[in-house]
């Protein structure tokens, strides 16, 4: 049973349910847990409606087809800003405020009683009768010496109940010297612990105006003053003083003056000096016989007895209860199952609650949690304030407490006391009678539950929190208290911090020692919440053996997957950067338990919980991260074979976690102090494991999720750190001219033009010396010119001897050369290194800025420097964001090789000299190559554009590796609320319902409208100010917004009703530009803007219409590789909301299908053509259907749901010209398409019935540049480079022609570059090469 269900079943009044497994973001309306099945259901419903439009079911299915329910890219991972993702080298560890800096103990208690029985002090006039009881002894009931001794013993016993382990010293009617010896002895014994000094001055005068207290001379004939300064010098700190005498505040004032507590710079010793005083300066102690003479001491040391006696006289029960019965309350104070024990328990809960609610949390922790005896005294001090104020006496403390005597929790205490007293006569009369427990705790838990139902972070915190803590001590209330505590902790990190501050930690830590099955689930949940806030608790857990509790839970058969995921999270935190935790969990077979669960996840098994898989991987990764023994055990347990299949899981979080686990299984590299020869003999099994791991990681280097690719980059950085030399060899091998053909997909860092300074930053490097067959290695150093003209001059250097090592100017690993052989550590296949270098360069030009930054960092690890692009000048204008959307990236130009043939420049520099690649694995007979260096003045130039070397010669090289983010990011899931209903999504659902209603109304209008003519005069005309004209545009379905982009991938958003620019930003900062298409994703919800570039890069933005607030949701490269001989990819894409698929193709032999819900390439469909794809159109009502137009004028229809996806192929266009536009016709017909050729003809086809066209429109005589087909209305539009737009009906009737802008001079429109219809209204947006975007509508529309 799930945790939420468990709570509900146990307490039906607690409406709690657990959120579905890996759905992190409540902002999404529908669950994505079963996207494929939902997709199939949606498609089935839409398919079933063909030919049956009369039934209600068909109408529903039709609306489902037109209004797809699929929502993508709205998980928690898409809310994380690119800029906020950590790339640093160290984590910021926050010191938890709830944890006490140090616990303290009162080690010694000095009791000084100055009673001088039978002699009243001269300044006291006693009433008759007056209070006489001291320590519950009547001093006149026995001989004075005996009475004094008995009182001293009683007082000592009363204190011992609160701190039995302290040493107690009593001085009765002492002299100054005796007090001095007592104090010095106590301090000597206590050492650094606290000393308590209790002073009873009932037999001496009240303190002097200077705060001196009185003691006796040896003969008891005089009162001797004792200065507070001397007392303070003997006891020192830490200390606590109790002064039970009249005018006791005089003493506090003297301490304050002594320590200068009033000044802001007072010493820290004042914090370690605590004082409790019985009354204020002008007050005398109560003399009423209602109270004992030492009422203050009685409150502090015997609170239950004192409280009941005081209450009894004020209760309605006073007539029927004999006060003497209070001394006979059955039970023990420390046994909560007895009446006395329960009363003490309730009293503790009440006073803790009062203190918690009135004191600052720091002061509460200091007084009520740091020292057991101090906590007890301050709880009892609250009672003293209540009782003594009724006698016009005001107890005082330092630190000063606010008034608490009228706090409403005292009413709850009075009720508990009354229930107790009402049972007392019967319990005393018949000891076998069972007492009825007080409903106090049940009622307080109910009050806490009411708060949980209505409270929040922004309301007053629940005052019952300290009571919940107390209830954990009771078996009968424990389960309910834990469930309610779990609900509270789930409200957020603020709630966890509050609970920890109140002192919950030691209680839940001790509960891990219980074996009660009922508590396991909720304890795991509570510890999940605690560790999500504060990982420092890992130390306490390992110290107390708590890790075994969670390993047993993880291995148990009864737990649900989401509960096991929490246990795996707890264990991951325990081993995170904590060697003792790693060792303890390794000994407890955590690796075996985790791998056992991964192995159990076979295809025949039920679909495993993604969150559980994710945390199993993260737990393993953290267990063997930088822990060689665990890595060895992981390899021996075939961890790779069990982790590798997870790289194809549909959830990006699982894939990223699996990459993390595999990456941390890689050894980071040998110690630079370790002998290279020793490293040569590494275990072959380790080499094979590394080889397998790297090959598996290279398979996901092009994953659709930045979360996954970031982990691949981090893993490759770890690999690069241990294999720097071999990767440099692989990089150097590509410098050979004959190797350039292998690099068709690798980028080059060419000269980058900075428009701001009109300078060119370029790197000039000399050619690489070819490896020679000469048996004797020879090396020459060559230096090269840094002339801005690019002329390279060779400077002869001194030759290096055979056995000299290559020096690294940045402290990289040295080659070890002896006898002509270079020893290389852990050698893998050369092809693996080559593939790694290609992968690193692919990452360095990643569409995601964060991944690109990581990729450049990996390249820096192997010594490859980069040219950094300077930020271009802001091109914004008033009303739009003038800054670029993210940090400028390195200028990684995409070209066919690393050579920049102009001026003979090589684009890369190695900080350490690259070596020619070996011909065999035994690297003998290598010729050393030239050392390539820059001139010092170039390196020192601020405008050189060179990145600083990442790795220096110091021992901190390893700390400079980029950090993984998946673990820290995943931890955030458990910081968020995991329990609760769907209230948060109701508002979102209402907004969607409103949009659906609007869409259905307008779809019906479009379908049943008769459009006679399109108005030549636009309703809006927008000068985009694009320098290269508008390349593509789209109209927002629910707002008067048009989004346009130019060839330089500058995006601008315009409100055409208000004629205002809303936002403008650059899609990216790479030098190569080219836009392919704009699409809207999730248009019925919070829409996202998909921007596809000509090179196949896809970037998806949120908040795109808000000035300066645009945020990159995700980015990936939709196409890998292109056809031989093709210079550019010329990517074309289309988005299908119904299936959640993005289709992409271009100068490539396949059409790739990306599932944006999984962020994964799910299929590559062969295009079945030698020509490149020039147009793509996905059906918006039939998921999986796709039409493609080719460069030779041919068309193909695919159904990607079928094993044989090609449905049919035809060539409707007579001339061999590329297909410019292609679209499915409006309606639910699955195979009617419209195709437009560059030659100017538009063909209408029904590909399911015949491959021939049933209608041809010769729209333009050549130069057709754009086609738009309305999604629902029977209208199409075409545009020409010859500056005109034509509009037609689906029957071929021309509805309009547009040639001129509406101006006095009748200026012709520009060469048409793009056309797009509004999806639900008859609006046409047209973009042209002259930077104008115009919006047209039809003249009249009437219902048929």
Curated annotation (Swiss-Prot):
Compositional bias annotation for Low complexity: 785-816
Description of the deletion phenotype: Embryonic lethality when homozygous. Embryo development arrested at very early stage (early pre-globular stage), leading to aborted shrunken seeds. Constitutive autophagy.
Record's subcellular location: Cytoplasm
One Pfam match: WD40
Source superkingdom: Eukaryota
Positions of the UniProt region annotated as Disordered: 28-56, 771-818
Tissue specificity as recorded in UniProt: Expressed in roots, leaves, flowers and seeds.
WD repeats: 1025-1064, 1070-1111, 1125-1164, 1168-1208, 1214-1255, 1259-1298, 1307-1344
Primary location class: cytoplasm
Listed GO biological process terms: embryo development ending in seed dormancy; maintenance of shoot apical meristem identity; negative regulation of autophagy; TOR signaling
GO CC terms of this entry: Cul4-RING E3 ubiquitin ligase complex; cytoplasm; TORC1 complex
Keywords carried by this UniProt record: Cytoplasm, Developmental protein, Growth regulation, Repeat, WD repeat
Primary role: Probable component of the plant TOR kinase pathway that recruits substrates for TOR. Modulates plant cell growth and regulates the activity of ATPK1 kinase in response to osmotic stress.
Quaternary structure note: Interacts with TOR, ATPK1 and ML1. Interacts with KIN10.
Family of this protein: Belongs to the WD repeat RAPTOR family.
Protein name: Regulatory-associated protein of TOR 1
Organism, as annotated: Arabidopsis thaliana (Mouse-ear cress)
Gene field: RAPTOR1
């Amino acid at each position: 049973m799930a945790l939420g269900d468990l709570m509900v079943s146990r307490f039906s009044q607690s409406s709690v349910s657990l959120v579905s497994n890996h759905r992190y973001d409540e902002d999404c309306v529908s669950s994505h847990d079963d996207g494929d099945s939902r997709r199939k259901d949606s498609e089935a419903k839409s398919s079933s409606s063909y030919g049956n439009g009369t039934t209600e079911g068909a109408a529903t299915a039709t609306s489902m087809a037109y209004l797809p329910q699929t929502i993508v890219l709205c998980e928690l991972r898409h809310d994380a800003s690119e800029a906020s993702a950590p790339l640093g080298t160290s984590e910021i560890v926050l010191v938890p405020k709830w944890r006490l800096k140090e616990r303290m103990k009162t080690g010694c208690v000095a009791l000084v009683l100055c009673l001088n029985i039978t002699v009243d002090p001269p300044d006291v006039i006693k009433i008759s009768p007056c209070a006489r009881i001291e320590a519950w002894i009547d001093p006149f009931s026995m001989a004075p010496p005996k009475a004094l001794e008995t009182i001293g013993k009683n007082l000592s016993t009363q204190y011992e109940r609160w701190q039995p382990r302290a040493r107690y010293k009593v001085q009765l009617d002492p002299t100054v010297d005796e007090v001095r010896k007592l104090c010095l002895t106590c301090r000597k014994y206590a050492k650094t612990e606290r000393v308590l000094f209790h002073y009873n001055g009932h037999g001496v005068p009240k303190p002097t105006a200077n705060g001196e207290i009185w003691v006796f001379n040896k003969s008891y004939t005089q009162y001797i003053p004792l200065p507070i300064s001397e007392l303070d010098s003997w006891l020192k700190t830490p200390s606590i003083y109790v002064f039970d005498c009249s005018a006791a505040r005089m003493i506090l004032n003297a301490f304050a003056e002594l320590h200068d507590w009033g000044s802001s710079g007072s010493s820290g010793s004042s914090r370690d000096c605590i004082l409790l005083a019985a009354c204020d300066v002008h007050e005398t102690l109560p003399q009423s016989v209602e109270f004992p003479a030492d009422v203050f001491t009685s409150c502090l040391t015997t609170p239950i007895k004192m409280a009941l006696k005081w209450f009894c006289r004020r209760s309605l029960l006073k007539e029927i209860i004999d006060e003497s019965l209070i001394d006979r309350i059955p039970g023990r104070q420390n046994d909560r199952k007895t009446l006395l024990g329960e009363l003490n328990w309730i009293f503790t809960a009440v006073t803790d609650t009062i203190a918690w609610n009135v004191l600052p949390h720091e002061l509460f922790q200091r007084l009520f949690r740091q020292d057991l005896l101090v906590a007890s005294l301050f709880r009892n001090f609250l009672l003293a304030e209540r009782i003594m104020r009724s006698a016009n006496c005001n107890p005082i403390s330092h630190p000063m407490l606010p008034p608490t005597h009228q706090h409403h929790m005292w009413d709850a205490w009075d009720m508990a006391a009354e229930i107790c007293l009402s049972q007392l006569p019967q319990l005393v009369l018949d000891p076998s009678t069972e007492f009825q427990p007080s409903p106090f705790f049940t009622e307080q838990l109910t009050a806490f539950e009411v708060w949980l139902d209505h409270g929040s972070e922004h309301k007053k915190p629940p005052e019952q929190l300290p009571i919940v803590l107390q209830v954990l001590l009771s078996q009968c209330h424990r389960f309910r208290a834990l469930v309610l505590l779990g609900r509270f902790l789930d409200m957020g990190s603020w709630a966890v911090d509050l609970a920890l501050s109140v002192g919950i930690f030691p209680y839940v830590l001790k509960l891990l020692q219980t074996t009660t099955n009922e508590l396991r689930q909720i304890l795991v949940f509570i510890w999940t919440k605690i560790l999500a806030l504060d990982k420092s608790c890992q130390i306490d857990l390992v110290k107390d053996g708590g890790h075994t509790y969670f390993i047993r839970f993880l291995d148990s058969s009864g737990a649900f997957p989401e509960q096991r995921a929490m246990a795996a999270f707890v264990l991951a935190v325990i081993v995170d950067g904590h060697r003792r935790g790693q060792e303890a969990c390794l000994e407890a077979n955590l690796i075996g338990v985790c791998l056992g669960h991964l192995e159990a996840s076979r295809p025949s098994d039920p679909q495993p919980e993604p969150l559980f898989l994710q945390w199993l991987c993260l737990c393993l990764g953290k267990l063997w991260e930088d822990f060689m023994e665990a890595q060895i055990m992981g390899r021996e347990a075939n961890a790779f074979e069990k982790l590798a299949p997870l790289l194809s899981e549909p959830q990006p979080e699982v894939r990223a976690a699996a990459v993390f686990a595999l990456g941390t299984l890689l050894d980071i590299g040998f110690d630079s102090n370790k002998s290279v020869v020793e490293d040569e003999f590494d275990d072959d099994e380790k080499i094979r494991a590394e080889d397998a791991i790297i090959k598996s990681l290279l398979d996901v280097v092009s994953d659709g999720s930045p979360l996954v690719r970031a982990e691949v980059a981090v893993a490759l950085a770890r690999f690069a750190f241990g294999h720097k030399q071999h990767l440099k060899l692989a990089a150097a091998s590509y410098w050979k001219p004959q190797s350039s053909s292998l690099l068709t997909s690798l980028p080059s860092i060419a000269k980058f033009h900075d428009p701001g300074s009109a300078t060119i930053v370029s790197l000039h490097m000399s050619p690489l010396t070819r490896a020679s067959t000469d048996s004797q290695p020879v090396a020459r150093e060559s230096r090269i010119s840094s002339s801005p003209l690019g002329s390279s001059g060779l400077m002869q250097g001194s030759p290096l001897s055979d056995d000299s090592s290559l020096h690294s100017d940045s402290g990289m690993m040295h080659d070890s050369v002896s006898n002509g052989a270079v020893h290389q550590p852990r050698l893998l296949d050369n092809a693996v290194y080559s593939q790694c270098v290609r992968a690193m360069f692919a990452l360095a030009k990643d569409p995601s800025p964060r991944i690109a930054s990581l990729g450049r960092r990996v390249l820096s690890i192997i010594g490859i420097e980069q040219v950094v692009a300077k930020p271009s000048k802001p091109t914004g204008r008033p009303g739009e964001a003038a800054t670029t959307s993210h940090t400028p990236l390195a200028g990684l130009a995409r070209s066919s090789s690393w050579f920049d043939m102009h001026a003979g420049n090589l684009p890369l520099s190695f900080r350490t000299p690259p070596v020619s690649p070996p011909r065999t694995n035994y690297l003998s007979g290598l010729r050393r190559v030239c050392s390539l260096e820059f001139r010092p003045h170039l390196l020192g130039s601020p405008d050189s554009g060179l990145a600083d070397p990442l790795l220096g010669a110091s021992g901190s090289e390893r700390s400079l590796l980029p950090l993984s983010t998946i673990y820290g990011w995943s931890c955030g899931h458990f910081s968020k609320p995991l329990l609760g209903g769907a209230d948060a999504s109701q508002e979102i659902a209402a907004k969607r319902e409103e949009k659906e209603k609007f869409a259905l109304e307008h779809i019906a209008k479009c379908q049943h409208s008769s459009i006679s003519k399109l108005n030549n005069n636009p309703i809006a005309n927008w000068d985009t100010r694009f320098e290269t004209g508008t390349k593509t545009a789209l109209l927002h379905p629910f707002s008067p917004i048009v989004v346009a982009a130019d060839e330089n991938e500058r995006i601008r958003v315009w409100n055409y009703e208000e004629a205002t620019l809303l936002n403008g930003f650059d899609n990216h900062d790479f030098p190569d530009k080219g836009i392919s298409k704009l699409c809207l994703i999730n248009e019925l919800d919070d829409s996202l803007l998909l921007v596809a570039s000509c090179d196949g890069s896809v970037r998806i933005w949120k908040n795109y219409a808000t000035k300066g607030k645009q945020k990159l949701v995700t980015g990936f490269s939709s196409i890998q590789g292109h056809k031989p001989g093709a210079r550019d990819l010329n990517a074309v894409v289309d988005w299908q909301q119904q299936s959640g698929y993005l289709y992409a193709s271009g100068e490539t032999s396949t059409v790739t299908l990306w599932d944006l819900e999984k962020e994964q390439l799910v299929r590559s469909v062969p295009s079945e053509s030698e020509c490149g794809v020039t147009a793509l159109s996905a059906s918006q009502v039939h998921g999986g259907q796709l039409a493609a137009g080719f460069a030779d004028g041919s068309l193909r229809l695919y159904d990607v749901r079928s094993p044989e996806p090609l449905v049919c192929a035809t060539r409707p266009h007579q001339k061999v010209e590329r297909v410019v536009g292609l679209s499915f016709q409006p309606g639910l017909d699955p195979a009617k398409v419209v195709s437009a050729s560059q030659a100017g003809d538009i063909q209408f086809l029904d590909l399911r019935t015949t491959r021939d066209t049933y209608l041809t429109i010769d729209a333009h005589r050549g130069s057709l540049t754009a086609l738009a087909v309305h999604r629902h209305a029977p209208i199409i539009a075409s545009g020409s480079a010859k500056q005109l737009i034509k509009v037609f009906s689906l029957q071929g009737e021309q509805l309009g022609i547009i040639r001129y802008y509406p101006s006095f001079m009748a200026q012709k429109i520009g060469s048409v570059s793009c056309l797009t219809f509004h999806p639900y209204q008859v609006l046409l947006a047209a973009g042209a090469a002259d930077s104008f975007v115009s919006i047209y509508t039809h003249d009249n529309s009437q219902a048929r």
